[in-house]
């Protein structure tokens, strides 16, 4: 069987470009204003000795200074760049090339680029890293106070099951999103084609956090199965919402299999599920606390850590914007920024409920005190009244208001 001439030509060109390509060994470079760095351009898999006399034309930018043209010597060319003004991710790339005896550049320049970030201060960059790891740790640890509280009380009374169910669905979708974006080569290839020369959208710490969060939610659900839960159930409204979210994910799978959308579009749809969950998951717990007039059973430690993580996340964005003089992160992705503020807003609501509105509530299993359940003054006063008052307290039914 003979192949069409166009296909044969494409294969031949692809084979040539696969050999004669230029790469940059330093894909990410960070320098301060007034500092310099050396970037290496290298011709890989060369097939002709004439390519050793190649001149590469480089891009120019007001943020960095570099030569217009660099001469390749012995298949290598070192380029010195200096930072002029703060900028994030400025691309230095090879625009064209000329070789003795050839009128057209025969080199593949697709990978001949470097992302250069010019910062104001290295000390500020170190602070940004510290803040980043701190909020990562705070968010990662934030799941454990609730699990510990459930274990100490041997009860999940006070933990709203709607919140927990939505959290499991949200982090399940988020974990799948990160796993596919980080490990699936097909997804990464499509992303690279649609977003050429963009940094990876998902890093390993994103994958670790998402999977860890999903497992933590799953363990908490197991506690709800084995510990006392009174009459608490998942509400009908929450079940309908979860069915809707799962159905959306299932439809996305179907249209992906039918080649109506790419697998990258399917992966992005998983992030929409997480965003939808974040927007609505806090309402059930806040309303549940209001109904019970108590936060006992709902760990304030979780909220304090989540508030710390969210606040430090925004602080890191501010510090990064200052260091590179780029505030686009706040308006270029308003959804992410808005969701962060939604979480912080509800964290403040929960802290007001716990410390101001319902600090002395009497509910079942309030005998565990500490950071999660402060010792109510009313219980201390009752203990001082003697046996008569104690008998009265023992005969009084716990105060719980059900849905």
From Swiss-Prot:
Domain of life: Eukaryota
Keyword terms, alphabetized: Cytoplasmic vesicle, Glycoprotein, Lysosome, Membrane, Repeat, Symport, Transmembrane, Transmembrane helix, Transport
Residue ranges annotated as Cytoplasmic topological domain: 144-162, 228-237, 284-294, 358-403
Residues annotated as domain PQ-loop: 124-190, 266-326
Cell location: Lysosome membrane; Cytoplasmic vesicle, Phagosome
Membrane side Lumenal: residue ranges: 1-122, 184-206, 259-260, 316-336
Membrane spanning stretches: 123-143, 163-183, 207-227, 238-258, 261-283, 295-315, 337-357
UniProt cross-references to InterPro entries, sorted A to Z: LC_transporter, PQ-loop_rpt
A single GO molecular function term of this UniProt record: symporter activity
Compositionally skewed regions (Basic and acidic residues) per UniProt: 374-388
UniProt-annotated stretches for the region Disordered: 374-403
Topology in the lipid bilayer: Multi-pass membrane protein
A Pfam entry, by short name: PQ-loop
Catalysed reactions, as listed in the record: L-cystine(out) + H(+)(out) = L-cystine(in) + H(+)(in)
One GO-annotated biological process of the protein: lysosome organization
Glycosylated sites: 45, 52, 78, 96
Gene Ontology cellular component terms for the protein in this record: lysosomal membrane; lysosome; phagocytic vesicle
Cytoplasm among keywords: no
Protein function: Cystine/H(+) symporter that mediates export of cystine, the oxidized dimer of cysteine, from lysosomes. May play a role in the degradation of engulfed apoptotic cells.
Family from the record: Belongs to the cystinosin family.
Name of the protein in question: Cystinosin homolog
Annotated source species: Caenorhabditis briggsae
